[in-house]
Each structure stands twice: as structure tokens, then as C-alpha cells.
Amino acid sequence: MISNEAFVLGCSAIGAGLAMIAGIGPGIGQGIAAGHGAAAVGRNPGARGNIMSTMLLGQAVAETTGLYGFAVAIILLFANPLLGKL
């Protein structure tokens, strides 16, 4: 029979892995945004400053979901609040 602590740790590891899946979306989105930004600068080099600042702001906003997933994974693995409930 598995102990309660082992079960919580196992489920926390699975949850941390699932939380890290949140990093896939921002990575793909940022790659697409960078590609389109480079294409836009190639078409209109005079608007480089506006294009780059807008692209970087959009990438920063998109990255927050990945960072939240990373924070949840770190909390589940190293500062597990569920272990205190046993």
C-alpha cells in the first residue's frame, strides 16, 4: 500500500510536469511573433522601432503564462503546501 506522503509527492510531480506544458504555447507564439516581426521589418525598414517595441511588448505579455507555469512547478516540487495537510 502506498503512503499518503508518497501519493502526494507523486501527484505533485505529475502536476509540475503538466504545469510546465504551459511553457510550450508561449515558446511557439514568441517564435511566430519574432518571425512575423522580422518579415515586417524586411518589408518596411523605416518602421523598425515601432515594430520591434510592439513585438517585444507582446512577447513579454505572452511569456507570463509560461512563467506562472514554471512558478507552480517549482512550488509543487520544492515548497509543497500539500504535505503540511497530511
From Swiss-Prot:
InterPro entries: ATP_synth_csu_bac/chlpt (IPR005953), ATP_synth_F0_csu (IPR000454), ATP_synth_F0_csu_DDCD_BS (IPR020537), ATPase_proteolipid_c-like_dom (IPR002379), F/V-ATP_Csub_sf (IPR035921). One of its GO terms (molecular function) is lipid binding. The keyword Transport applies. The record marks 63 as: Reversibly protonated during proton transport. GO terms for cellular component: plasma membrane; proton-transporting ATP synthase complex; proton-transporting two-sector ATPase complex, proton-transporting domain. It is a multi-pass membrane protein. It is found in: Cell membrane. Keywords: ATP synthesis, Cell membrane, CF(0), Hydrogen ion transport, Ion transport, Lipid-binding, Membrane, Transmembrane, Transmembrane helix, Transport. Its main location: membrane. The chain crosses the membrane at residues 8-28, 64-84. NCBIfam families: ATP_synt_c. F(1)F(0) ATP synthase produces ATP from ADP in the presence of a proton or sodium gradient. F-type ATPases consist of two structural domains, F(1) containing the extramembraneous catalytic core and F(0) containing the membrane proton channel, linked together by a central stalk and a peripheral stalk. During catalysis, ATP synthesis in the catalytic domain of F(1) is coupled via a rotary mechanism of the central stalk subunits to proton translocation. F-type ATPases have 2 components, F(1) - the catalytic core - and F(0) - the membrane proton channel. F(1) has five subunits: alpha(3), beta(3), gamma(1), delta(1), epsilon(1). F(0) has three main subunits: a(1), b(2) and c(10-14). The alpha and beta chains form an alternating ring which encloses part of the gamma chain. F(1) is attached to F(0) by a central stalk formed by the gamma and epsilon chains, while a peripheral stalk is formed by the delta and b chains. Belongs to the ATPase C chain family. HAMAP family: ATP_synth_c_bact. This is ATP synthase subunit c. It comes from Lachnoclostridium phytofermentans (strain ATCC 700394 / DSM 18823 / ISDg) (Clostridium phytofermentans). The gene is atpE.
